[in-house]
Structures are given as structure tokens and as C-alpha cells.
Amino acid sequence: MGSRRFDAEVYARRLALAAAATADAGLAGLVITPGYDLCYLIGSRAETFERLTALVLPAAGAPAVVLPRLELAALKQSAAAELGLRVCDWVDGDDPYGLVSAVLGGAPVATAVTDSMPALHMLPLADALGVLPVLATDVLRRLRMVKEETEIDALRKAGAAIDRVHARVPEFLVPGRTEADVAADIAEAIVAEGHSEVAFVIVGSGPHGADPHHGYSDRELREGDIVVVDIGGTYGPGYHSDSTRTYSIGEPDSDVAQSYSMLQRAQRAAFEAIRPGVTAEQVDAAARDVLAEAGLAEYFVHRTGHGIGLCVHEEPYIVAGNDLVLVPGMAFSIEPGIYFPGRWGARIEDIVIVTEDGAVSVNNCPHELIVVPVS
């Protein structure tokens, strides 16, 4: 399952880079409340409550953690102590927003906050800072979008773990069992194969496969069903796996096999289009063009991919209109799908990492339509 966080040196480097990016943006500091950004910067998995917990990161100066005194024990699970971060604890009746302002040098001060900060903290913080904060998305997104070697290693291990789960899926796909039965087996396997927890399980059989985000239900599997299985878990220091394969219970009809072969070609075309200097929308177009030529464009109803890391869905998004230029270290899914309402659907998904001259996949289980024999 891996360590729950990285060594302190990793977080120290990230804090320094975030402070530099903050200064480059002309801001006095960042205020990071619990969420993926806080986990990225100091390895904290704190949750947002009505009491303010925040990492305050000045563009120049020492960072500090402002948090309720009752949360001091939980802070020890992060890298804060090893990093030597100043702790500004407070008790009920104190003004935590004033503490944040003081760390940043007093109001008024131009500050960025994470997009996960709730209004119950944003509004009093704006009063304390004397100016409405801006979102820190642009400051932090580049850091999180380009993965370090430690992150890539975690994604590779997560990918290998989810491959092992897919290798076990055929044994679960027995006619007469429900999607929920299969999902329960898969969830157990996700943890058994090395994840710390289950992120999601989609088991879409027959017509349910035409709903990309179906989930699972009490529908019983039947011979002839095409089954979309999209699964993911959390590995080690919070990094995710996410992989989709499509299964056929018994031999598929010829029209299913033909359409699926076009989907394979589309997924391969997108993968082969990836290299530094290419834009995200060009990768999306590579998959979409193959399906359009096959007369299947109207059945591909979502983007080709999404970034992945601490969050299952994060930047970069592989979608039409996104002119973001790909660089080595970016990690994202390639997952074209075709969906025939009321009939069946199919999707193939791998997580890939941009390299100096192309891309590598962290998933290596078969891309073919996987036929599950019926006894």
C-alpha cells in the first residue's frame, strides 16, 4: 500500500516552488485550506470543518499552519513538524482570520486561496485581509500538473495494482449475479491488491453500459451482456489508479466486435499522438477523428481524458478547445468510449505519462474486448 506520505524533503521543495510561483504572480501569499492542495504541499489529510485550518504560505517569509488547538494531534500525521512549520493554534473565541492576516503582514494584502475554501471561511478571511482573495488555481496548477518522479512512481504502482484487479474481474462476471455483487467483489480486490482504499467502482452491464457514470445496480448479468468496468483506488501517499476495460459475457455479436475494434483504434491513435509540444486538444482530436471516420462520432459523448494524481480528475483535461501544450511529467487518462442508449456501451482507459519523446502507460492489461466464457 506504500507510505501514507513522502519524505519531508519532497514537501520542502514543493513549498519553495509554491512560494516562488506566488511571488511571480504578484501576490503576498497563499492560504491553503484542507483539500488536495494541502495534501500536496505538506502531506496533510485534514478535513474542512467550521473551525479554520489553513496553511499560510507567504511569498517571502516563513510559512505557518493556523489551526484549532484540538487539531494539533492530527497535524502530527503531516510533514509539518519535520518541515519546522510555525504553528499558530487557536481556541474557540479567538479570531483565526486575524492570525492569518498577521502571518501575511497585516491588511490589506493581496492573497490567493484554494478553490476548495468554503464561503464560511472565505468571507471572514476577506474582511481580515482587507481585500477579496483570488483563486490559487493558476499558482498551483502547474506544480501539480507536472508530476515529480516520486509521484510518477506512485502512479505506476497504483496502475499495476489496478491491473491486477482487472485480471480478476472475469471470475466475478457470472450470469445471474448482480452488478452490485460484482462491485462488492471488485471493491474487496482493490484493497487486497495493494490500494489503501476504494475510490470508485462502475459496473455497467447491457444497457447500463451506455451510461458513462452509471455506478452499479441490482440488475442481473446475462449471457450476451457487454459490461463496462471502470475502477480506481487510492495508493500510498494519496495517488489514484483509474482504469476501464470492457468485457463480453459469452461471444459478442459481430456488430459489437466491429464497433469495439474502432474504439481500440481510436484509443491507440490518441496514445500515439502524445508527445511534448502537442496540445491537449490535438490528442482528443486523434481519438475523435478515428471514430468519426467509422461513423461513430455521435456515440462518443465525453472528452478523451483527464489528469490524475491526488485527485481522480484534475488538470490537464484532454478535450476540444484546450490548447495547453503537453510537457514531460504530465499524467492523464486516455479513455474514448462509445455508448448506444438502451443497448450497450464500451470504454478503454489507460493512465499515461508524457515522456521526452512520447508517452508510457502505467496500465498493461489487455485492450481487447475481454470475452468471459459461459459454462
Swiss-Prot record:
Membrane topology note: Multi-pass membrane protein
Family: Belongs to the peptidase M24B family.
A Gene Ontology term for the protein's cellular component: plasma membrane
Documented EC number(s): 3.4.13.-
Main localization of the protein described in the UniProt heading: membrane
InterPro entries reported in the protein's UniProt record: Creatin/AminoP/Spt16_N, Creatinase/aminopeptidase-like, Creatinase_N, Pept_M24, Peptidase_M24B, Peptidase_M24B_aminopep-P_CS
Name of this protein: Probable dipeptidase PepE
Transmembrane region(s): 15-35, 55-75
Gene3D superfamilies: Creatinase/methionine aminopeptidase superfamily, Creatinase/prolidase N-terminal domain
Organism: Mycobacterium tuberculosis (strain ATCC 25618 / H37Rv)
Cofactor: how bound: Binds 2 manganese ions per subunit.
